[in-house]
Design a protein with these regions (language model features):
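Hydrophobic alpha-helical segments, especially N-terminal targeting/anchoring helices
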Residues: 77, 177-178, 184, 299, ...
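Glycine-rich phosphate/pyrophosphate-binding beta-alpha loops
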Residues: 159-170, 189-196, 290-294, 322-338
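An anion/pyrophosphate-binding glycine-rich loop and adjacent beta-alpha core
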Residues: 17, 135, 139, 143-145, ...
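Glycine-rich loop(s) and the adjacent beta-strand/alpha-helix scaffold that form part
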Residues: 46, 90-163, 338, 347
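Internal hydrophobic alpha-helix adjacent to the cofactor/substrate pocket in enzyme cavities
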Residues: 145-152, 241-244, 249-252, 259, ...
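A glycine-rich dinucleotide-binding beta-alpha-beta segment and adjacent secondary-structure elements
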Residues: 74, 247-330
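Conserved redox-cofactor binding core of oxidoreductases
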Residues: 1-94, 114-115, 261-281
């Protein structure tokens, strides 16, 4: 939007957000060589709180009352199946609140609902270092209530994973292997979201970033502290990690050959990041991912919640992450969730505002 990105930006996708709110979001994977990607990135002042402040101000101007500590437990339908309101808990009492135009579900993920996680996405427990990301209130109430009135649910068995190490610089110069000591990624691929997806395709969703002292010396203090396993030989490092020493030594030897030629014939890693792993001691950093659920409610072009037949459920709408269509098994990139939240929220709001009062 014409904003100038200042010189304080970090040259790679390892960064902290500067005061300006503008930063470099790395585009290291050029899908089309003749159309190079453009460095980009923007965070509003105050980050998420900045959005909320503006929205709350708009609500105050319009006299909209926002009730907190009043969780909705059920949807209310009339005899014809129209959603006419909700049941909410206000302290120790339950009360019915009538919705004259409609109910919009915008409750997000079910990351924090252990029963739903165990039922729909038990695979996230395979890597003990992987953790859910999101708010503690992401309990799946919206999914439960919508399903209870016949809504079609989408992607309940999917997650959106984002691999994390101590930083992008940590992984980009290393060699990543799975539990079978097989390299499975270019290490530099665009965004942690794509790296996370590749990790979930490996045995037990686990792996290690392997590197040597030469590479470790380039890390910051936090990165270096995350190097959990250390040994004077590759075989010794494998034993410390519970990997096969012969297989890991073979994989490192193959990787070093690629580094020496400067051409990654396996995954196309840029020559700048092909560093021979040869200077002891050697290190291994366990790979993990943060995840969020993708399970959502099917909506139509008007943000109306629909049944498996495609028929809209009168009076019921969904917006934000809980509205299907945002993504499937893969988050397409940074900032996408926010754009989907604003788009579907505005769509649902306009549709509901145009509704006549329910009978």
């Amino acid at each position: 939007m014409g904003a100038e990105i200042p010189a304080e930006i970090h040259p790679t996708d390892t960064h902290s957000i500067p005061e300006s709110g503008l930063y470099y979001s790395d585009a290291s994977c050029e899908l089309f060589p003749d159309k190079p990607l453009t460095p980009r990135g923007h965070v509003v002042v105050g980050q998420g709180g900045g959005f909320l402040k503006a929205l709350l101000s708009g609500a105050d101007e319009r006299g909209i009352e926002i009730r907190t500590g009043c969780p909705v437990t059920d949807l209310v339908q009339d005899g014809e199946g129209r959603v006419t309101g909700v049941v909410a808990k206000d302290g120790s009492k339950s009360k019915r609140i009538r919705a004259t135009k409609g109910v919009v579900i915008a409750t997000g993920h079910f990351n924090e609902n252990e029963e739903m996680v165990n039922r729909h996405i038990p695979m996230v427990k395979r890597n003990p270092r992987s953790v859910a990301t999101g708010h503690p209130s992401a309990l799946g109430d919206g999914q439960r209530m919508a399903e209870g009135v016949g809504a079609e649910m989408v992607g309940m068995g999917d997650i959106s994973p984002s691999m994390y190490t101590a930083g992008a610089e940590t992984s980009i110069h290393s060699m990543m292997v799975n539990l079978r000591c097989q390299r499975f990624w270019s290490e530099q691929g665009y965004t942690n979201n794509f790296r996370g997806t590749r990790l979930t395709q490996q045995p037990d969703h686990q792996g290690f970033a392997i590197f040597d002292e030469k590479i470790r010396a380039t890390f910051g203090e936090v990165d270096a502290a995350e190097a959990e396993f250390k040994a004077d030989t590759i075989e010794g490092l494998a034993e410390a990690c519970g990997l096969d020493p012969v297989l890991l030594a073979r994989s490192v030897e193959r990787y070093n050959q690629l580094c020496e030629t400067g051409v990654d014939l396996e995954y196309g890693k840029h020559p700048e990041f092909l560093d021979v792993i040869s200077e002891p001691p050697f290190f291994a950093m366990p790979l993990a991912y943060v995840w969020m659920t993708s399970g959502a409610i099917r909506i139509n072009e008007n943000a109306q919640v629909v049944k498996p037949s495609g028929e809209a459920i009168p009076g019921l709408y969904a917006a934000g992450i809980i509205a299907a269509g945002r993504m499937g098994k893969q988050n397409p990139g940074s900032g996408y969730n926010m754009m989907w939240n604003f788009y579907t929220g505005r769509l649902a709001g306009r549709t509901v505002a145009a509704e006549g009062e329910s009978e």
